[in-house]
Amino acid sequence: MAQSVADVMKLVKENDVKFVDFRFTDTKGKEQHVSVPTSHFDDDKFESGHAFDGSSIAGWKGIEASDMLLMPDSNTAFIDPFYEEPTLVLTCDVVEPSDGKGYDRDPRSIAKRAEAYLKSTGLGDTAFFGPEPEFFIFDGVTWNVDMQGCFVKVHSEEAPWSSGKEFEHGNSGHRPGKKGGYFPVAPIDTFQDMRSEMCLILESLGIPVEVHHHEVAGQGQNEIGTRFSTLVQRADWTQLQKYVIQNVAHTYGKTATFMPKPIVGDNGSGMHVHQSVWKDGQNLFAGNGYAGLSEFALYYIGGIIKHARALNAITNPGTNSYKRLVPGFEAPVKLAYSARNRSASIRIPYVANPKGRRIETRFPDPLMNPYLGFSALLMAGLDGVMNKIHPGEAADKNLYDLPPEEDAKIPTVCNSLDQSLEYLDNDREFLTRGGVFSNSMLDAYIELKMEEVTRFRMTTHPVEFEMYYSL
């Protein structure tokens, strides 16, 4: 990746680039793009930006005030590895043309404001994030929703239901089975080469890869672990990681999804988020307390637990998210913390070096907009530090198997998107500090997500026929 405007212009020349792709992320977390020929691109674009219609993005401006600017970040430049014509990609901030400031609903601008807010508090100067997005790769998927009815069909040769099927190339018989994907070698793991190609492309684009493997679900669930980084850069990387994964799968004739729960009866996909806060080169999470944590880290955990249900609206932003957040599928529903205990929603991983001390928030999923999610987690944690919110005693036991009287004492994450949106509506002050999230943005976000809730509520489901048709 390039570092300066001069580097970018050099990339364009050396690679005979034909188009420049300006990319930005919408509220829901989907990257959008517009391409311009290099004949209409010069270094002035980094000062003047590229105009576009903001009213076309759900939850953004109305048509009466829709002019917006895409302001490219030269540090994000790379040559797209999938386009046939040589194309330079630039990640952009969305700014107001009237004053050049970041648009209050632009996720990347929100992430930048979160980083600035951390510094302004004097509590720390750098927040590191390390997400672990899991994903499924299917051979194909078909669905339809209309007045006649609805259906979805997942096609996966690796899935247990394919053991009795005939395939043109034969049926190898080697399959992981339900919850058996973590993690036998090939030929049971059929995605080794595809994941390796994804990793090589990620590294060529400047994202360090640490590990890749099959995940638990036996229908093509996978994970590629990449390195942590600062808030905005790590959010940029997460968007690029999803882009590479989906496009490599596409070149193989497969389809990759980051839906949290596409399969009934097997594990869903999470996106655990590792976090730490530093100041003057020192890890503020390292200390002499429980599991080597500092008081700062414990208060940070306390803030996340206190605001977890409001956070769910951002970290688990789909109706499908809450089909994952149920007991029995390794989903972290209990709002507790523990060292190495994966049944707690916040885990403190073992590290040999205090520099690596961090916490792992386990309830987020890969539908999460990384710019919004990382920012919200940071704001919740900082609220805990500023208000000295202690999380209580650690939960060093299996939270999936507690006696009823103990189980009732431990709070849980939300059980639906609409519940989480209600919590967000009533618990938002920690997000609006320093102007990081605006009330206008949160109102628009809640309205946008309630449209999803309403659509889901109004759609008759096949399970309802199974339960009620003959009564």
Curated annotation (Swiss-Prot):
Dependence of activity on temperature: Optimum temperature is above 30 degrees Celsius. Heating to 60 degrees Celsius for 1 minute abolishes 72% of the original mutase activity, and no activity remains after 8 minutes.
Keyword hit for Isomerase: yes
Top-level lineage group: Bacteria
Description of how activity is regulated: Is inhibited by H(2)O(2). 1,10-phenanthroline inhibits the activity slightly, but other metal cation chelators such as EDTA or tiron have no effect on the activity. Divalent metal cations and hydroxylamine have also no effect on the activity. Due to the relationship of the protein with glutamine synthetases, glutamate and glutamine were tested as inhibitors; neither preincubation of the compounds with the enzyme nor their addition to the assay buffer affected 3HAP mutase activity.
Family statement drawn from the similarity comment of this UniProt entry: Belongs to the glutamine synthetase family.
Function according to Swiss-Prot or TrEMBL: Catalyzes the isomerization of 3-hydroxylaminophenol (3HAP) to aminohydroquinone, a step in the degradative pathway of 3-nitrophenol. The enzymatic reaction is regiospecific since it leads to the formation of aminohydroquinone exclusively, without producing the isomeric 4-aminocatechol. Can also isomerize other hydroxylaminoaromatic compounds, such as hydroxylaminobenzene to a mixture of 2-aminophenol and 4-aminophenol, 4-hydroxylaminotoluene to 6-amino-m-cresol, and 2-chloro-5-hydroxylaminophenol to 2-amino-5-chlorohydroquinone. Does not act on 4-hydroxylaminobenzoate.
The protein's name: 3-hydroxylaminophenol mutase
Species the sequence originates in: Cupriavidus pinatubonensis (strain JMP 134 / LMG 1197)
